[in-house]
Amino acid sequence: MSYAALKAVPSASEATALLSAGAVRARCANVSEAVRRGETRYFRLVSNRLDEAARRVVDVTRRRYPDLAVPYHSRWRHFSTGGFDRAALIARGADTTETARARIDLAIVSVLLDAGAGPRWRYHEAETGQVLSRSEGLAVASLRAMQTGLFSADPATPWRADAEALALITPESLARAFQHAAGNELVGLEGRALLLRKLGEVCVRSPALFGVPARLGRLYDHWSPGDQPLSANEVLGTLLKAFGAIWPGRISLAGVPLGDCGRHPAAPGDGLVPFHKLCQWIAYSLIDPLQAGGLRVVELDGLTGLAEYRNGGLFLDCGVIAPRDPDLLQYPLDALSEPVVEWRALTVTLLDELAVLVRERLGKSADDFPLVKVLEGGSWVAGREIAFERRRDGSPPLAVVTDGTLF
């Protein structure tokens, strides 16, 4: 074998380098610059339309948070939908440490169940009488499922997610908890159940992170020793390495599973473009329970915007991202296909650019108004609102085929 051939073999360190938010930002920038130069096949950028997207985000932010006291974009906002403080139910009467563990348990499981529910699904919450759909419905359904002890092997302590119970999750048990039925179909049940079972398996294999017996909330104990602040990138790095094996049928490099990662010819080397949407959504959603548990989480802007259909849909519906062929938006696309990778990469890059414009218009600095607040204020809601303006069912402008483990 030649020296050149030896050099072409990817190493585990090259693979591990892709397991970071920095790699997401850099590889997405590679693709976005190629789009700006007109070198890609599927989309073009109409940069002067970014002002319209920023205007919408600013208007939504001022309407939702008139005092601009915007909380972090996280799963916790969904748990309080309808004005009910459901988070107050979690591990009532427990001490600070156990409450932090229980909230981490819920955040991780709930985010992993947060892939698109489909347009027909609704959750009827008996306790409040609310009928909820999409992300809010999935959040509340997951909280109520945990309240019943679905994710706990100990009937006496339902507010926990441990490996033993996760290993027993089936599509049928999720269907019951999430009220899946004819006419009320929740898409991706098989994929969701498989994801949780695999989650239980990786917890057992990592006792240093999840303890013995293995429990998701033990991550709090892993991160809590010492007085040093915890960076958001450190949180994400732990999640990516711990959960890499749970994603079904994804790309591996040098034996390292890369999780939420696609390919695009504009990216260097093997053309790999990581996004790590769900793991970053978990990382954002762990900030609140970690801080409530006494930890200081810093460098929040080290994480990226989330490459999903509300943020990405905002840019498509505002005309910032324009398909070269309008017919591209007329039929479902595979989640790992080149046009979807291109669209998601543009979304990550444009969210950083959008954040600058939003801060300028709100009179805020990056320290006062990090990206996580732009998302919450925010781009996600603006993306949903314009989707309902354009399409009666609020569906995204680009349809992506999902197995319940990506979007």
Q: Where are the model-predicted features located?
A:
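Extended, well-ordered protein cores
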Residues: 2-293, 299-327, 331, 338-407
